[in-house]
Amino acid sequence: MLSAEEKASVLSLFAKVNVEEVGGEALGRLLVVYPWTQRFFEHFGDLSSADAILGNPKVKAHGKKVLDTFSEGLKQLDDLKGAFASLSELHCDKLHVDPENFRLLGNVLVVVLARRFGGEFTPELQANFQKVVTGVANALAHRYH
């Protein structure tokens, strides 16, 4: 999936990520850009506008939780299916989340990282992160197959 150099570049940048801020923004943007994903978060309260979503403390808290889990997965880049097996089972069997949403969230995360890191987020680094988020999305969707 990733060479040693590609892994190092991903881990180096991710070490600079403020998980709380980036996680909250990524989940918030997912809910704004792809409003049908809101159905999984109706219990979060006010999701009536972009401002409401991006300012919602439950969205921010869950976004942090998601990115904390993503961060843990980065420690197992060679076994993403194993790293995310229990979450795949939860999202498939209990939550019934459309696995396409994992891909969408990964793409939104890449956008947020590009926005936050600007020129430091080179096209090569973007390609490396895209490989990672695709791998994570595939691992989360594994139970569905």
From Swiss-Prot:
Annotated Gene Ontology cellular components are: blood microparticle; haptoglobin-hemoglobin complex; hemoglobin complex
Q: Which domain of life is it from?
A: Eukaryota
Which processes are annotated in GO (biological process)?
A: hydrogen peroxide catabolic process
Q: Name one GO molecular function term.
A: oxygen carrier activity
Q: In which tissues is it expressed?
A: Red blood cells.
Keyword terms: Heme, Iron, Metal-binding, Oxygen transport, Transport
- What does it do? Involved in oxygen transport from the lung to the various peripheral tissues.
Q: What's this protein's family per the entry?
A: Belongs to the globin family.
Name-wise, this protein is: Hemoglobin fetal subunit beta
Give the organism, scientific name: Capra hircus
